[in-house]
From Swiss-Prot:
Broad class of where this protein is predominantly found: cytoplasm
Primary enzyme class: ligase
SUPFAM superfamilies per record: MurCD N-terminal domain (SSF51984), MurD-like peptide ligases, catalytic domain (SSF53623), MurD-like peptide ligases, peptide-binding domain (SSF53244)
UniProt-listed GO biological process terms: cell division; cell wall organization; peptidoglycan biosynthetic process; regulation of cell shape
Higher taxonomy: Bacteria, Pseudomonadati, Pseudomonadota, Betaproteobacteria, Burkholderiales
Keyword Membrane: no
Gene: murC
Catalyses which reaction(s): UDP-N-acetyl-alpha-D-muramate + L-alanine + ATP = UDP-N-acetyl-alpha-D-muramoyl-L-alanine + ADP + phosphate + H(+)
Compartments in which it is found: Cytoplasm
Short name of any one Pfam family annotated for the protein: Mur_ligase
Similarity remark: Belongs to the MurCDEF family.
GO molecular function, one term: UDP-N-acetylmuramate-L-alanine ligase activity
Name of this protein: UDP-N-acetylmuramate--L-alanine ligase
Keywords annotated in UniProt: ATP-binding, Cell cycle, Cell division, Cell shape, Cell wall biogenesis/degradation, Cytoplasm, Ligase, Nucleotide-binding, Peptidoglycan synthesis
Length: 468
């Protein structure tokens, strides 16, 4: 891809989708600059790798750039975007730049409403264990790599494909994984589930004729689109008819044990015993997707099993922050703290089920910050149902993510609905800054505290650890 444009500037370089692309381009030898509203571990890492990172957005930041990259989170009136257009500098959407990266290698793209980051990470890990040395660009920090991107020397690039803004339709992979299809980011699809499903069909149709669609057989919406996918299909899941099928699934603390049965065209392959270093049935499905890809690419069974057994996880995906002391005033003892990115009811239910499976005899305390008023409105009853499944709930105000407040779709409304449902008496903490102390005031010996959300609540586990 090396050509006359040598200097590429990223507006919002600290974002999960932007930073990985920037890092790969840095390693390809490009001059990378970028800006973000605040310094973070991500911006510091990129600066340490050689990027010039500015805090704050100003027109001067784009000086010398041959192109600037933006995400859908960057508004058109951003001063850097305005300056670039005035200077005739190409403004490139993030997904287009990712598509350009994928042209350098054979692309494996992971799409789906839930589980993309973990599945992408698992696929990258099993390919690495099979000595395929993949490049990867992931929406979360792969713990074993210490980063969310890496430039490998192998022929494959594994990427997370974003359906939230339909930008995954810019990608041209040779393998496409669809983990599930759920009603989220529906503003993009005119609140029409049929349009959402059509987008996923189009995603698979962008595969070449020799490509492969790897589809989850356990998801009803994915099953609905299968008749319209005209590329070779490999299915995976716990369903009896899946080509790559998990059987005899057992939880063992925070690990899952299961056997994989596989079909290679009409031939049955030997069973594969897996011990997955992640909890929950949803992660069994994510691992089965990785097994399906690895099997198709010829990764040895021993390498697949080793990669899944030693998988160290992804940042903020059921991350065990540690064991912390309960204040003496509350009887002492210890509690377990889990950090998780989940913000949709389906994701939340899966994470809570994983916590129950890992610690069946302990109280599960959920500290949750809703993300976006529109999602809270659209999924309100589902949020009430899922929140009611925890043993105790601490609830904050909605993280707006730039949206204006909506009547009856805020944190207080959720708290009221939980009380009316009678399942639970939530503790409402209006300011998320007060949540770390609220957790310590509430927790008791043996509790498992799951801190969950996609907004500013991400800082809470670290603050709880400092206060404990």
């Amino acid at each position: 891809m090396k050509h006359r444009i040598q200097h590429i500037h990223f507006v919002g370089i600290g974002g999960s989708g932007m930073s990985g692309i920037a890092e790969v381009l840095l390693n390809l030898g490009y001059t990378i600059s970028g800006s973000d509203l605040q310094e973070s571990a991500v911006t510091r890492r990129l600066a340490g790798l050689g990027a010039h990172v500015a805090i704050g957005h100003t027109a001067a930041n784009v000086a010398g750039a041959g192109a600037i990259v933006t995400s859908t989170a960057v508004a058109g009136d951003n001063p850097e975007v305005i300056a670039a257009r005035a200077a005739g500098i190409p403004v490139v959407p993030r997904a287009i730049m990712l598509a350009e990266l994928m042209r350098l290698k054979r692309g494996i793209a992971v799409a789906g409403t839930h589980g993309k980051t973990t599945t992408t990470s698992l696929v990258a890990s099993v390919l690495a264990a099979g000595d395929l040395d993949p490049t990867f660009v992931i929406g979360g920090r792969l713990t074993s790599a210490g980063a969310n991107a890496r430039l490998g020397q192998g022929e494959y690039i594994v990427v997370e494909a974003d359906e939230s803004d339909a930008s995954f339709l810019n990608l041209l992979p040779v393998m496409a994984i669809v983990t599930n299809i759920d009603a989220d980011h529906m503003d993009t699809y005119g609140h029409d589930v049929a349009r959402l499903k059509s987008a996923f069909i189009e995603f698979t149709q962008r595969l070449p004729f020799y490509g492969s669609a790897v589809l989850c057989a356990d998801d009803a919406n994915v099953r609905e689109i299968m008749p319209f996918v005209s590329r070779p299909i490999t299915t995976y899941g716990l369903s009896p008819d899946a080509h790559v099928r998990g059987e005899n699934v057992q939880a063992d603390g925070t690990r899952m044990r299961f056997t994989v049965q596989r079909q290679d065209r009409a031939t049955a392959l030997p069973p594969l015993a897996i011990e997955l270093n992640l909890p929950g049935l949803h992660n069994v499905r994510n691992a089965l997707a990785a097994v399906a890809v690895a099997t198709e690419l010829g990764v040895p069974d021993e390498a697949i099993a080793q990669a899944l057994a030693s998988f160290k996880g992804v940042g903020r995906r059921f991350t065990q922050t540690g064991e912390f002391p309960v204040p003496a005033a509350h009887g002492g003892g210890t509690f377990t703290l889990i950090d998780d990115y989940g913000h949709h009811p389906v994701e939340m239910a899966a994470t809570l089920a994983a916590a129950r499976g890992a610690w069946p005899d302990r109280r599960i305390v959920l500290a949750f910050q809703p993300h976006r008023y529109t999602r809270t409105r659209d999924c309100f009853e589902d949020f009430v149902r899922v929140l009611g499944g925890a043993d105790a709930v601490l609830l904050t105000e909605v993280y707006a993510a730039g949206e204006p407040p909506l009547v009856a779709a805020d944190g207080r409304a959720l708290a009221r609905a939980l009380r009316v449902a009678g399942r639970i008496e939530p503790v409402f903490v209006e300011d998320v800054a007060d949540l770390p102390q609220a957790v310590l005031d509430f927790v008791r010996d043996g509790d498992v505290v799951v801190v969950m959300g996609a907004g500013s609540i991400s800082k809470v586990p670290g603050l709880v650890g400092e206060l404990a």
